[in-house]
Amino acid sequence: MLILISPAKTLDYQSPLVTTRYTRPELLDYSQQLIHEARKLSAPQIGKLMGISDKLADLNATRFHDWQPDFSPENARQAILAFKGDVYTGLQAETFSEADFDFAQQHLRMLSGLYGVLRPLDLMQPYRLEMGIRLENAKGKDLYQFWGDVITDKLNEALAAQGDKIVINLASDEYYKSVKPKQLNAEIIKPVFLDEKNGKFKVISFYAKKARGLMSRYIIENRLTKPEQLTAFNSEGYFYDEQASGKGELVFKRHEQN
């Protein structure tokens, strides 16, 4: 079973590390090509392209400039511990045991605009380059054209390595668009999280993102290997709704939080 999640814009390079183990990202040659393109942009151009403040644009211009491919624990950090958005609040990798990291390293993949596909223990240097950004490059007008089949091929490699044909899609649409489902040698299962608001169940972005992290953690902690095992997920009040599920979707609901 291979779990896909999105990265986060918020990064943490300060907290104490809970593991000293690390691996190197497998697609750094591609990352270097993107860095080459990104370095051509001035801070104001970055700000406009990404829709961010001058301060953030300056920070990311500096990050692109400082980026270099010789990753070490001194200048980089394991991806699963560097990302700090809502998904990662639910995942809480800072409380993982070494055995949890082992399982995650095999079964969890983070999709990334700059790094393509990251394993949990892959070192990464700080960056901001969302998959939906229209960064022109030698292969086309945006990152989807840049990555082409590369991400899908990498995921197929991971599936073959574990002798498995199930993908659990917990990534956002923006990131999942970088995957070509028809070329993926897998059955794709998409958990959907609905929260009750004014008597109606719907996707509430903040809660749904955190729930994707909670589900990832649930799979990792319990060493789950079959999609039907996911239906027992009940973290933070969610419950499986069999009637609402179907067509590759597992629907989980939660009553209004008081």
Swiss-Prot record:
GO biological process, one term: response to hydroperoxide
Cellular component, GO annotation: cytosol
InterPro entries the record matches: YaaA
Name of protein: UPF0246 protein CKO_03380
Organism: Citrobacter koseri (strain ATCC BAA-895 / CDC 4225-83 / SGSC4696)
Homology family: Belongs to the UPF0246 family.
Species lineage: Bacteria, Pseudomonadati, Pseudomonadota, Gammaproteobacteria, Enterobacterales
